[in-house]
């Protein structure tokens, strides 16, 4: 599986590489708190470059761009030093804005192209930095993915750290190793604060796609009625109108949900973050997506 968070199978991207000119290696990590890929690249820059070369060959691409936030000049220099004049592999600094890590925004920023369904339509394959490192270790050393780098952070964990843990390790043990919780009632998120999923308790295990554990104060259910201010629509990177999708959800109007482009939502969390009524808009849109998908089945 890919290690970028979605767990999309890496091999699928390289099955039909016709027309692919670029491979973009995503080391952006635009979500707050998360620095697991940063730590991985700092420690394994040589493997990252080796993985980039392998991915370039698999995709039969002309150029590989290793995309890193401009706010990490130390990481940029580290990777540039590891390149050692590697042919067709370049470091591409990108702005530190959210959601720069989303593949559509990354393609727009680096290649100045738009596409409909998949990045291959713009002549690109997107791969995560940790995936590139794992590919290098698999090819050179025959190593399987048995460990995962995670960022354990947030206001309610005593000793936040980037940790390397075995896949399948209980989250409760990881939290304990980081000093435990700072208060009795917390909000535990698998992932980052914007796109992560809130988990009821810490009785679950690490999988290969997990990149962070975020521990925040328990959310107060202080939502009020929608003000119809339109901020969720103004800030949606996919150009959707979450307020109208939510209205369609409440009316159970599946055709309207689909018409409003609900399946284009990337669940970035921006609409929930910006909502002055403190409504979990992202969860409403997520529910609408599930309903549309079930109807298609």
Language-model features and meaning:
Residues 142, 148-150, 196-212, 235-237, ...:
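A glycine-rich, aromatic-flanked flexible loop/lid motif
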Residues 18, 43-50, 59, 74, ...:
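Conserved active-site and cofactor/substrate-binding residues in soluble primary-metabolism enzymes
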Residues 61-171, 177-181, 192:
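Hydrophobic alpha-helical positions that pack around
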Residues 11, 33-35, 102, 160-161, ...:
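Short helix/loop capping segments that flank catalytic or ligand/cofactor-binding pockets
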Residues 3-6, 10-12, 25-29, 36-38, ...:
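Fold-independent oxyanion-binding glycine-rich loops
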Residues 1-65, 70-86, 94-102, 228, ...:
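Iron-sulfur-cluster electron-transfer modules
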Residues 98-101, 105-111, 125, 179-227:
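Active-site gating/interface segments in enzymes
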Residues 210-223, 233, 237-297:
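Ferredoxin-type iron-sulfur electron-transfer modules in oxidoreductases and energy-metabolism complexes
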